[in-house]
Amino acid sequence: MKIIVINPILFTHEKGVIPHVTTIKETMIYDLCLAYHRAGHAVSLIAAADYAPERKETYDFEVVFLKSIGRKIFQPSVLPFLPGVWRYLQQRKGDVDMVLASETFSIPSLFASLIVPRKTVIWQELGAHNRKMKTWPSRIWYNIIARCFMRKAWIIPRSYVSQRFIRRYMPRVGDPIGHGVVVTLEKEMSNKKSQFLTVGRLFWEKNVISVIRKFDAFLSNRKNIKNGFDIAF
C-alpha cells in the first residue's frame, strides 16, 4: 500500500514553545511509519517544518516538512496551517491507498477529508473540546466543519473517552486502538525483573498517576502477583 501519514505536531510543546531537537526518530509517529515501512508499505510522513530537527537526518522513508503560515492565529504548537498539504495530496490522490491524519480538529485532516474522503483515516486522541477562546473554535469545528465536510472519513479513537466524544459529531467511528510497540528493539533483556513502568513526560493532562493507581488496585486483589512487583514512576 501507499500510505501518507499527516502528523504536523511531532512532539509536545512546553507552554507554546516548540523545543529544538536533534532527531525525530524517537517520536511515536516515526516508529509507526517505520513499522509500515518494514511491513512492505510505501510510506510518507508529513510534518510541520517547525518541528524539523536542527541537523539534517537520513530517514528510512520519505519525510516531508512543510511550512506553516498565519502563525499568530494558527499557532504551530496547537493548530498549524500547512497549505502545502493541499498541493501534496492533490498531486498524489490517484496513487495513494490511505491517508492517516492526526485529530479531527485539524486543518490537514480537513484537507484530506475533502480531497480523498474515502481513503482518509483520522486517529482521535482528544476526548474534550480544546479550551482555547473558551472552547468556541473547537465547538464550531466539530459541530459545523467536521459534520459537513469530514463525514466520510473513518475515525479511529485512541481511548473510550475519545470514542464517546467524537461519536457525538462523526458517523463513522471505530473501536479504540491502543499503543503499539517500538520496532527498533532487536533483542530481549535476559535479566528482567517484575516491574510496571510508565514512560512519558509528566504533563498533568496525561494523568499518569491514575495509571499507577489503577494498576495497584488491579494487583491488590492478586496478592500472589503483587508481592513480586515493583511499582514506580
For each predicted feature, which ranges?
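N-terminal subdomain of nucleotide-sugar transferases
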Residues: 1-51, 94
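Conserved donor-binding/catalytic core segment of Leloir-type glycosyltransferases
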Residues: 4, 156, 188-206, 211-217, ...
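Acceptor-binding helix/loop patch of EC 2.4 sugar-transfer enzymes
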Residues: 12-16, 68-73, 120-148
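Membrane-proximal helix-turn-helix segments that form the acceptor-binding/catalytic region
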Residues: 30-34, 90, 114, 128, ...
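A short, active-site helix/loop in glycosyltransferases that binds the activated sugar's phosphate group
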Residues: 49-54, 146-174, 181-185
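A short, charged, and often flexible helix/loop element on the N-terminal side
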Residues: 59-87, 129-131, 137
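Short His-centered aromatic/hydrophobic patch
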Residues: 101-107, 124
